[in-house]
Regions:
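An acidic-aromatic
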Residues: 1-44, 119
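Short secondary-structure transition/capping segments
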Residues: 12-25, 51-60, 110, 114-115, ...
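Gly/Pro-enriched, hydrophobic low-complexity segments
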Residues: 31, 58, 64-150
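Short, functionally important structural connectors and interaction interfaces within domains
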Residues: 7, 25, 37-40, 49, ...
Length: 151
């Protein structure tokens, strides 16, 4: 799984072979985290942004329909997801998803921390089942890029 973030600060996130890599382009640094025993938790969180099926979401989250909203002219179902895993609950209290039921994709996501802070993600120009280039799953680093592996 790969994510390219363009604002407010450009970065790339790659989850591959049980390792999460965060490339911060401004400081030219990759921070690598081994999922190890937390692999299931990492995969459940990453899948929120990558089209997990309803069955997969129900394995990891309590799901409540909060209503219908229109986002960018698209009729969406607003879902409130609460993590089932205690480890996930310690860093994520719940997630709001605005799902397009026709395309089965999330258009907007709001991740809430226990502190009340949140991160809002809004997807535009979504292409379903488009061709994906192989290089999207490689970080665009240089020979000068610093690699950090926190303990």
């Amino acid at each position: 799984m790969a994510v390219k973030i363009v604002s407010p600060e450009p970065k790339q996130v790659l989850f591959k072979d049980g390792k999460l890599s965060l490339y911060q382009t401004k400081i030219d640094q990759v921070t690598e985290y081994k999922a190890g025993q937390n692999r299931a938790e990492v995969e459940s969180l990453m899948s929120l942004g990558f089209g997990a099926s309803g069955t997969d979401l129900a394995k990891n989250f309590e799901i409540k329909l909060q209503g219908l909203d229109t986002v960018d002219g698209v009729r969406t179902a607003r879902l409130d997801l609460t993590p089932k895993q205690e480890k996930v609950k310690s860093s994520l209290s719940h997630v709001l998803l605005w799902m397009d039921p026709k395309r089965n994709v999330s258009i907007k996501q709001q991740f809430f921390e226990p502190s009340g802070d949140y991160r809002l993600t809004h997807y535009t120009n979504i292409k379903v089942n488009g061709k994906i280039a192989d290089d999207l799953f490689r970080l665009k680093i240089t020979s000068r890029t610093k690699i950090v592996q926190p303990q």
